[in-house]
Amino acid sequence: MDSQLVNPPSAFNYIESHRDEYQLSHDLTEIILQFPSTASQLTARLSRSCMKIDHCVIEYRQQVPINATGSVIVEIHDKRMTENESLQASWTFPIRCNIDLHYFSASFFSLKDPIPWKLYYRVCDTNVHQRTHFAKFKGKLKLSTAKHSVDIPFRAPTVKILSKQFTDKDVDFSHVDYGKWERKPIRCASMSRLGLRGPIEIRPGESWASRSTIGIGHSDADSEVENELHPYRHLNRLGTGILDPGESASIVGAQKAESNITMSMGQLNELIRTTVHECINSNCKASQTKSLK
């Protein structure tokens, strides 16, 4: 039976944080959100419930001169994710634009973990000095609990522009996409029997991915297995020039032998005899005696 979202306790009805002033910063700076009290969280934890954000409203009220320029970027991060993947939604709007930002969560979290959502802001391309108290932020948070998580229909973030000199063409907002999933087939000996039609069932030594055509394409799985079983099956598609291995080892060896200077045993003996004779003649000639005058 599907779990239904229960009516949250009164403590979970739009918990409001204080409307606080924040200093201008070019780096991500946290906006403090007020979450349910520890006692309320403990009550929900004892009932073995999980929790999600139904609705989050971030109110931005500027306090800068009318000739101030720049953009404010507000981001919601989920700290259960790695640092470079934690961003969930973001908004960009002019620094002089009073605006309400609306966010709807699409996931539950366990109360056994710290509350994962963090809210940050930063200002870019501005002519206002850093550390100036440029605006006030206020957060409103509505949460709900469930006995266990259920699929939540996606609701896109949105905005409500309060300054008349700005329109929807002056703001932007975005939300992350669903995580990508690629099924990885289990390696097994009988994966060569692929793509069978009819009712899908697995046999001993097989995997669901090897028998079905869901997820990874049949051709991909087939080619991966066939490449291992028959690595040379597609060589006939190549031209003869590519397949020609060149001269055989015996021909190459014979050609090398022919390229060397060769002589018979008799010729070698004659060469040695002549060389020795020349050496003797040149070293054994009697020296001419000098006459005494």
UniProtKB/Swiss-Prot annotation:
GO biological process entries: transport of virus in host, cell to cell
Q: Name one GO cellular component term.
A: host cell endoplasmic reticulum membrane
Disulphide-bonded residues? none
Would the keyword DNA-binding turn up in this protein's UniProt record? yes
Name the record gives this protein:
Movement protein BC1
UniProt entry keywords in alphabetical sequence = DNA-binding, Host cell membrane, Host endoplasmic reticulum, Host membrane, Host microsome, Membrane, Phosphoprotein, Transport, Viral movement protein
Described purpose of this protein according to its UniProt entry: Movement protein involved in the cell-to-cell and systemic transport of viral genomic DNA. Begomoviruses use 2 proteins to transport their DNA from cell to cell. The nuclear shuttle protein (NSP) shuttles it between nucleus and cytoplasm and the movement protein (MP) probably transports the DNA-NSP complex to the cell periphery and facilitates further movement across the cell wall.
State where the protein is found.
Host cell membrane; Host microsome membrane; Host endoplasmic reticulum membrane
Species for this entry? Tomato mottle virus (isolate Florida) (ToMoV)
Q: Does the keyword Membrane apply?
A: yes
